From Swiss-Prot:
Catalytic activity, as annotated: L-tyrosyl-[protein] + ATP = O-phospho-L-tyrosyl-[protein] + ADP + H(+)
SUPFAM superfamilies linked to this entry: Protein kinase-like (PK-like) (SSF56112), SH2 domain (SSF55550), SH3-domain (SSF50044)
Record keywords, A-Z: ATP-binding, Cell junction, Cell membrane, Cytoplasm, Cytoskeleton, Kinase, Lipoprotein, Membrane, Myristate, Nucleotide-binding, Palmitate, Phosphoprotein, Proto-oncogene, SH2 domain, SH3 domain, Transferase, Tyrosine-protein kinase
Residues given in the record as ATP binding sites: 281-289, 303
GO cellular component: actin filament; anchoring junction; centrosome; cytosol; Golgi apparatus; plasma membrane
EC number annotated for this UniProt entry: 2.7.10.2
Active site positions: 394
Organism in which the protein naturally occurs: Mus musculus
Name by which UniProt lists this protein: Tyrosine-protein kinase Yes
Gene deletion effect: Knouckout mice show reduced OCT2 tyrosine phosphorylation and reduced OCT2-mediated TEA renal secretion. Knouckout mice are protected from oxaliplatin-induced acute sensory neuropathy. Mice are viable, fertile, and display no apparent phenotypes. This lack of phenotype may be attributable to compensatory roles of the other SRC-family members.
Start and end residues of each SH3 domain: 89-150
Subcellular location: Cell membrane; Cytoplasm, Cytoskeleton, Microtubule organizing center, Centrosome; Cytoplasm, Cytosol; Cell junction
Covalently attached lipid (S-palmitoyl cysteine), positions: 3
Record's keyword annotation contains ATP-binding: yes
Length: 541
């Protein structure tokens, strides 16, 4: 969400295959200090989707009822704890997966491996717990602990993680051949997948996936000739012998401490005085973005909005919805200052906006595989927004944030419809992002998930051109007129034709003919691996 100033019919063909696909390029040191991105295991939300737009009085509908393309859905993170609520008497013992430093006087500091009795877990993301080691009680983030006697407590178990996210994690710089993790199978209920980092002369660093199947009697196997009573015994066996796998299991893949769900218990509408603005990161037509600290303890990003940008009551209503949208490719909304000037407090992402990263940061040096992977991450987040019947309305590189190891997260989802500035609400004013907006949205205000798909096609051109302004040499009015007449941007230099064909699908005149984000995600995630089997049979298996 920010100021825009103008400067200047086929299905996808066979996908581009590079001669050598190497591991992702590692970004250099943080621009604003070391910070991590959330790539820890997440759990699936159960139950039917909620139409968030109907709750927030959006004048136009959410996702289109027509889904012209298929594609595999991906995992997404919990909206609330997946554990049973109402535990009494501390019967279930939980163990910490990560260290945690208390942020308030009501919080409980703890170390990885510390055990707890849960006193009260009925209040969502923050549980009241008692440390068995110290006897102290306080609130702990519920996504930092798991039942002590469960498979989730194993360091190598990463839960509901998609194949692509497993590959991103295992291929992080510094990881060696044989590093591994176990996750839930995406394709077979009750089964698991073993993902291992490998190397060969043809592909270089790569990841192999093996399906772990479950026997009727409860045992587990990759090959029927080697069966085990428990997953733990299976993992132990393959750490001692490769036994047909591409490599013996060496060390567990390092995980990254996840973001907590919110800053602390009951820290939603917070006092302005609890925030310290420290480093100005950017400025737009509607406000500024700062790196700062909450409560003297927690690094955050703070978006400050100019008075009059939006009605505080409408913002607070929308923010209540936005904070329920949780996915590891969406920037989490932590807290708000709801009186003008409005402050929006979110996770701090160390590399800043994707636009700045491509134009001025290490993104200038990225090659096509890394750029396609970033597009796939954005499509992953948008596919979640699609499933939740929500709309972004302002999808472009300036509203994507980048963290360590090229992790991308979508920011500012849903805020655009609240802006009250006349130069924006006119839809053709100087501040409106015409070049990213679908014609039916720019001309008639028909914003849907399909207009977001159009914007994603424009965002793809930003990626492959390293941040070039779309429609170079054309002003806003000219763009609107030409697009209405059927003009579409030509294939950017160095962009494979199959990627340009995907862009053209996103730019179909009829919104219902545009692909779903689910399809786009599937297309991009498999862009370089479409000819390979998803699971390896292994040698002599």
């Amino acid at each position: 969400m920010g100021c825009i100033k103008s400067k200047e019919n086929k299905s996808p063909a066979i996908k581009y295959t590079p001669e050598n696909l190497t591991e992702p390029v590692s970004p250099s040191a943080s621009h604003y200090g070391v910070e991590h991105a959330t790539v820890a295991p997440t759990s699936s939300t159960k139950g039917a989707s909620v139409n968030f737009n109907s709750l927030s009085m959006t004048p136009f509908g959410g996702s289109s009822g027509v889904t012209p393309f298929g594609g595999a859905s991906s995992s997404f993170s919990v909206v609330s704890s997946s554990y049973p609520t109402g535990l009494t008497g501390g019967v279930t013992i939980f163990v910490a997966l990560y260290d945690y430093e208390a942020r308030t006087t009501e919080d409980l500091s703890f170390k990885k491996g510390e055990r707890f009795q849960i006193i009260n877990n009925t209040e969502g993301d923050w549980w009241e717990a008692r440390s068995i080691a110290t006897g102290k009680s306080g609130y702990i983030p519920s996504n930092y602990v798991v039942p002590a006697d469960s498979i989730q407590a194993e360091e190598w178990y990463f839960g509901k993680m998609g194949r692509k996210d497993a590959e991103r994690l295992l291929l992080n710089p510094g990881n060696q051949r044989g590093i591994f993790l176990v996750r839930e199978s995406e394709t077979t209920k009750g089964a698991y997948s073993l993902s291992i980092r490998d190397w060969d002369e043809v592909r270089g660093d790569n990841v192999k996936h093996y399906k772990i199947r479950k026997l009727d009697n409860g045992g587990y196997y990759i090959t029927t000739r080697a069966q085990f009573d428990t997953l733990q015994k299976l993992v132990k066996h393959y750490t001692e012998h490769a036994d047909g796998l591409c490599h013996k299991l060496t060390t567990v893949c390092p995980t990254v401490k996840p973001q907590t769900q919110g800053l602390a218990k009951d820290a939603w509408e917070i006092p302005r005085e609890s925030l310290r603005l420290e480093v100005k990161l950017g400025q737009g037509c509607f406000g500024e973005v700062w790196m700062g600290t909450w409560n003297g303890t927690t690094k955050v990003a703070i978006k400050t909005l100019k008075p009059g940008t939006m009605m505080p009551e409408a913002f607070l209503q929308e923010a209540q919805i936005m904070k329920k949208l949780r996915h590891d490719k969406l920037v989490p909304l932590y807290a708000v200052v709801s009186e003008e000037p409005i402050y929006i407090v979110t996770e701090f992402m160390s590399k800043g906006s994707l636009l700045d990263f491509l134009k001025e940061g290490d993104g200038k040096y990225l090659k096509l595989p890394q750029l396609v992977d970033m597009a796939a991450q954005i499509a992953d987040g948008m596919a979640y927004i699609e499933r939740m019947n929500y709309i972004h309305r302002d999808l472009r590189a300036a509203n994507i944030l980048v963290g360590e190891n090229l992790i991308c997260k979508i920011a500012d989802f849903g805020l655009a419809r609240l802006i009250e500035d006349n130069e924006y609400t006119a839809r053709q004013g100087a501040k409106f992002p015409i070049k990213w907006t679908a014609p039916e949205a720019a001309l008639y205000g028909r914003f849907t998930i399909k207009s977001d798909v159009w914007s994603f096609g424009i965002l793809q051109t930003e990626l492959v051109t390293k941040g070039r302004v779309p429609y170079p040499g054309m002003v806003n009015r000219e763009v609107l007129e030409q697009v209405e007449r059927g003009y579409r941007m030509p294939c950017p230099q160095g962009c494979p034709e199959s990627l340009h064909e995907l862009m053209n699908l996103c730019w179909k005149k009829d919104p219902d003919e545009r692909p779903t984000f689910e399809y786009i995600q599937s297309f991009l995630e498999d862009y370089f691996t479409a000819t390979e089997p998803q699971y390896q049979p292994g040698e002599n298996l």
